Regions:
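Penicillin-recognizing serine hydrolase domain
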Residues: 1-119
Length: 119
């Protein structure tokens, strides 16, 4: 298998990602807690070497209601973004594929959800 997801035969739909994300949220919620952090420290070689990892997802540092997500980019697929937000006690999952402005598109979708649905 190709764990990087870069191999061209590896592709999925928004429905596939929704199923995967629901599973992770139910069975392994700590994964998204990690992806919501602005930065984290890891240790290599039995704690002899400390490294700081910075999250490239801007929501981790700018949106307190951001629960986690995953960014992605390839030349073939362009920008992709999976984001989970908390809004009025509900988890909002937004998935954006194939865009050069994935964060702007996610913001547009999030604002639409807030206007279109009664919570």
């Amino acid at each position: 298998g190709d764990s990087t997801g870069i191999f061209p035969a590896n592709n999925g739909t928004a429905d596939d990602l929704e199923i995967l994300i629901r599973y992770i949220l139910e069975k392994h919620p700590g994964i998204f807690k990690i992806t919501a952090q602005e930065k984290a420290e890891i240790f290599e070689n039995s704690k002899a070497i400390k490294k700081e990892l910075l999250n490239i997802n801007g929501y981790a540092s700018s949106r307190p209601n951001f629960l986690g997500g995953k960014t992605g980019f390839t030349d073939e697929a362009n920008g992709n973004l999976v984001s989970i937000f908390e809004y009025k006690g509900h988890k909002i999952l937004l998935i954006v594929f194939g865009t050069s402005n994935r964060f702007e598109q996610t913001d547009i979708l999030f604002n639409w959800v807030k206007e279109a649905y009664i919570f």
